Amino acid sequence: MTERKKLVLVDGNSLAYRAFFALPLLSNDKGVHTNAVYGFAMILMKMLEDEKPTHMLVAFDAGKTTFRHGTFKEYKGGRQKTPPELSEQMPFIRELLDAYQISRYELEQYEADDIIGTLAKSAEKDGFEVKVFSGDKDLTQLATDKTTVAITRKGITDVEFYTPEHVKEKYGLTPEQIIDMKGLMGDSSDNIPGVPGVGEKTAIKLLKQFDSVEKLLESIDEVSGKKLKEKLEEFKDQALMSKELATIMTDAPIEVSVSGLEYQGFNREQVIAIFKDLGFNTLLERLGEDSAEAEQDQSLEDINVKTVTDVTSDILVSPSAFVVEQIGDNYHEEPILGFSIVNETGAYFIPKDIAVESEVFKEWVENDEQKKWVFDSKRAVVALRWQGIELKGAEFDTLLAAYIINPGNSYDDVASVAKDYGLHIVSSDESVYGKGAKRAVPSEDVLSEHLGRKALAIQSLREKLVQELENNDQLELFEELEMPLALILGEMESTGVKVDVDRLKRMGEELGAKLKEYEEKIHEIAGEPFNINSPKQLGVILFEKIGLPVVKKTKTGYSTSADVLEKLADKHDIVDYILQYRQIGKLQSTYIEGLLKVTRPDSHKVHTRFNQALTQTGRLSSTDPNLQNIPIRLEEGRKIRQAFVPSEKDWLIFAADYSQIELRVLAHISKDENLIEAFTNDMDIHTKTAMDVFHVAKDEVTSAMRRQAKAVNFGIVYGISDYGLSQNLGITRKEAGAFIDRYLESFQGVKAYMEDSVQEAKQKGYVTTLMHRRRYIPELTSRNFNIRSFAERTAMNTPIQGSAADIIKKAMIDMAAKLKEKQLKARLLLQVHDELIFEAPKEEIEILEKLVPEVMEHALALDVPLKVDFASGPSWYDAK
């Protein structure tokens, strides 16, 4: 019997790139981006399972320069720089391959394709079946009766297999002719020029007639079409060069042999360690790791959950783990499925109808003395409020505790926290209810046990989480900030914000009319009607008809992305109109129509969802609608705020905004004398910075100087690099670097803070805010310069951003208490960035003008005064 020999060759860069863009930007609890590694691991696991290779190698590109650059200097010149979020994941991909005991190889001056081509041909001679995996169709030229090329399509696991027959079926060509096709049509992704004006269809037609580029060029006279003949004659050398560039080498000087690529299985222990470190719980389950642990976990024994038909006070004791169950993300709309309670008397499931109709149950939920332990108290507050019940006595929130301890983790349900702490007593919501459109409510037996297990997990986790919070000096952050804030956010969400639907619709009509105007103007300049939203049609108009210089090409034609158009804005009037057209179109579709979709028809209110346990800095964000994201650079964008109005007659919107809070926090943390002096004396900080950096008197500071100073002031807060500042100011990187150096020379305290924060973070592994919030930054020890630089900037800016976020949260808690204490009707509606938005009766506005700044400015004592600007008006737009 012939021994089975199968070699799998993988284009590592291509699949890593594909995985990165196919998945959302994920990160683990330490803040390390992981989406490319996760996707690559999924591809790898599927590959090993499906292909069962006897031999395997993953090839990588060794660098940016290859022997092909000697032929054509601009080879791959149009490619965008690899995103740093992907670059930082490449070492983990290599580490993963080592754990899987899969050979990897790269060769200076050669591409991964050349390594693959050389090994494929060598393996064919040795009688191997060969499978090549890539996202690059160039490799289809390697397809033979012994080599199949698998090209990824959508996502990361959907592949198309190219055999010689499939190549013929798809292109009408042989695999050997793929390089001829590239020679004629070029390849924008690799910046291979080809012959201008020759696309895929023309190239295929010519090759069917002439077989190869060389034979075609020998027989140009036989080509039909005068223009095509002229192009082929003019670009003859370019066609031959393009074919050469597209040709994969099959005799590269590699130092590995096929026989040395034997695959004998992976190192289970190492793979599990990597998956755990990166937070790949789903992949751990696929390895069987969790199930193995679960079998040893005695707590998985059946629990006795009693279904309650009549709520009595003897089961409602304090403290109790309490579950308010819904499925789906939008808890403002999802119905409650039921409740569960676990305490010293037992485990209970209470069907929704029985619970909400029970006065005993309602009294217990609304009794502040009856302590409840929950998961996501804000969600529970909102869900119960829609039933006319106020949740009180929520003493412990598993979600918030876990978030404070592990801010980089994403906790979707109780099971995800339980797993992190080695508890296997509850299944994930997804495994019980299903996902997406397949989500469904199970039988009452299944539901009652699932809810009972959830409550049991909450009860079991509490002690562990409290202990860890105490050890981290974070119990006060949890008890005094995040827990009370959750209840306030819940009230804000359920109160909602009134939307003037008629005004919003009028805005939509106005924007529609403006869009029409721009469309007509663009068509007039172009000299013909065309679909402005079609990149292909727009590209033809801009680059062929008008003749603008081509900045970048895509596989389907010319790139007309925003960054490309901005580079061309000064070249022709039409470009500015197109940019305006797109901005107006986005305002209309994303914001006007988007807001109308989420506005409740009965109350004309939107009920956003604040994400309290999401960001690593502690900042709040919001969803459905994302109120943080309403554009304010364009006047049309700012005007959208006109649609947010008071919910009652003779009321106004009142907005209060921290002035330069992050710079004030920086002054406090860094103890920089210059910054402290400026803020203490209420100086214009940007003018002061310009004076110090440019060494000029106050009256000599120009608007350009102040603008540069402002950019560097805020840039420092966000850990800006010389590159980032150069982009913001439109200056060279060298000039930006010199500006930053002069800034740090003038602000020695800031310089010392930046250096000290990085050193401290390297020693501890994390940075902290003024209220002891932590952010873990393991990338500080990375050997990769880009990863390490990003981590250092994170170490510098997180204490500033995080402390500012904590201050505004504290202000919200203090304000809620003051409104209640003074028995005011005013309501806190929104928190957006550094701004608090209220609605209040007109007669209370004068009170708020004194009360709100006083409370906000004293939320936390700093070495410099906090300053609050405020205004009121009939809409959010007018409160400026």
UniProtKB/Swiss-Prot annotation:
Recorded superkingdom: Bacteria
Q: Which CDD domains match?
A: DNA_pol_A_pol_I_C, DNA_polA_I_Bacillus_like_exo, H3TH_53EXO, PIN_53EXO
Q: Where is the 5'-3' exonuclease domain?
A: 174-268
Pfam families found in the cross-reference section = 5_3_exonuc (PF01367), 5_3_exonuc_N (PF02739), DNA_pol_A (PF00476), DNA_polI_exo1 (PF22619)
Which GO biological process entries does UniProt record here? DNA-templated DNA replication; double-strand break repair
Which SMART domains does the record associate with it?
A: 35EXOc, 53EXOc, HhH2, POLAc
Q: Where is the 3'-5' exonuclease domain?
A: 302-470
Catalysed reactions, semicolon-separated? DNA(n) + a 2'-deoxyribonucleoside 5'-triphosphate = DNA(n+1) + diphosphate
Q: Does the keyword Iron-sulfur apply?
A: no
Tell me which stretches of the chain form a coiled coil. Answer: none
Q: Which InterPro entries match?
A: 3'-5'_exonuclease_dom, 5-3_exonucl_a-hlix_arch_N, 5-3_exonuclease, 5-3_exonuclease_C_sf, DNA-dir_DNA_pol_A_CS, DNA-dir_DNA_pol_A_palm_dom, DNA/RNA_pol_sf, DNA_polI_exonuclease
Q: Which NCBIfam families match?
A: pola, PRK05755.1
What functional role does this protein have? In addition to polymerase activity, this DNA polymerase exhibits 3'-5' and 5'-3' exonuclease activity.
Q: Which family does it belong to?
A: Belongs to the DNA polymerase type-A family.
Quaternary state and interactors: Single-chain monomer with multiple functions.
Q: What is this protein called?
A: DNA polymerase I
State the organism named in the record: Bacillus subtilis (strain 168)
The lineage is: Bacteria, Bacillati, Bacillota, Bacilli, Bacillales
